[in-house]
Amino acid sequence: MNENLNGILNVYKEAGWTSFDVVAKLRGILKTKKIGHGGTLDPSVTGVLPVAVGKSTRLLEYMEAAGKIYEGEVTIGFSTETEDADGEIVSKTPVERELTESEIDSVMKNFIGKIKQIPPMYSAVKINGKKLYEYARAGQTVDRPTREITIKSFVRTSPMMTDEAAGLVSFSFKVECSKGTYVRTLAVDLAEQLGYAGHMSKLQRTASNGLMIKDAVKLSEIEVAMEAGELSSLMYPAEYAVSDLPRVNLTADQFEMARVGKKFAEDDWVTDETTDSPVIKSNKSKFLLTDLSELTRDKFAAFYDDKLIAVYMKHPEKAGIWKPNKVLV
């Protein structure tokens, strides 16, 4: 077994593979069990699948929580049981009136910001210990709780394509969204607001954790690199797993505090009027520190000498206190 590998791979997931299939294949190629992916993709969806190897698997939760960017296609005129092109048609609503691009663009703006979404029946969300797709395959429908997601941007990226004979309208889109977003459901809800049944006819993840589709590599390329002893050329540092978190650069004194798991208190900070920078007033030492009271997130990645040292989080019970969520040194 090869237990010395550590880092992030930007894997291009091809159609037909589940995310677990990719992980299982990589375990064989890399000869290590310590592998995990940073966000599930449906079998028909292609694109960026961040994969953590070795000690970097400790950071999987941050990879999974990161925002994602997708590009795909919506088809209006019929819906499917799976909300994508793979499912059986369940409803047909031919587009018989003039649907304009400006109308589509206007409705897409309704989805920007925090919205509620109901997970599709064909999904891995668990209800009463059972995955929704298991209920769906048994012909059962169950109540699903809504979840709050965030849509940062949602725009049409192609002209509207019309098939008058079939009563269909299609167009490409790009969406930047939070963890837990079902883009299939977004497509269905968009069509519904336009007054029709619809589905997501294509989808590709183009970015995740700072990893871009143009740099993604196929499993076959990883296998060749491994055999040639050149895997390091494809491996990204563990820091990519936390690229979605705010970055705080530590001084030497702060590093000593972080590496032994000490907390940071916002009340310890004052402003050095000569530099207009926040400084620590505890321990009789004055050293620069990012003013964490200004951070809008509940976690931050702590770096020293350009290396990831720890991930800190707001204390759940003590206001103004930041505690280590994971110490990595």
Curated annotation (Swiss-Prot):
Reaction it catalyzes: uridine(55) in tRNA = pseudouridine(55) in tRNA
The protein's Enzyme Commission number: 5.4.99.25
Matching CDD domains: PseudoU_synth_EcTruB
SUPFAM superfamilies: Pseudouridine synthase (SSF55120)
GO molecular function: RNA binding; tRNA pseudouridine(55) synthase activity
Superkingdom classification of source: Bacteria
Record's keyword annotation contains RNA-binding: no
This protein's UniProt keywords: Isomerase, tRNA processing
Location of the active site: D42
Example GO biological process: tRNA pseudouridine synthesis
InterPro entries in the cross-refs: PsdUridine_synth_cat_dom_sf (IPR020103), PsdUridine_synth_N (IPR002501), tRNA_psdUridine_synth_TruB (IPR014780), TruB_C (IPR032819)
Enzyme class: isomerase
Role summary: Responsible for synthesis of pseudouridine from uracil-55 in the psi GC loop of transfer RNAs.
NCBIfam families according to UniProt: TruB (TIGR00431)
Family: Belongs to the pseudouridine synthase TruB family. Type 1 subfamily.
Protein name: tRNA pseudouridine synthase B
Species: Lactococcus lactis subsp. lactis (strain IL1403) (Streptococcus lactis)
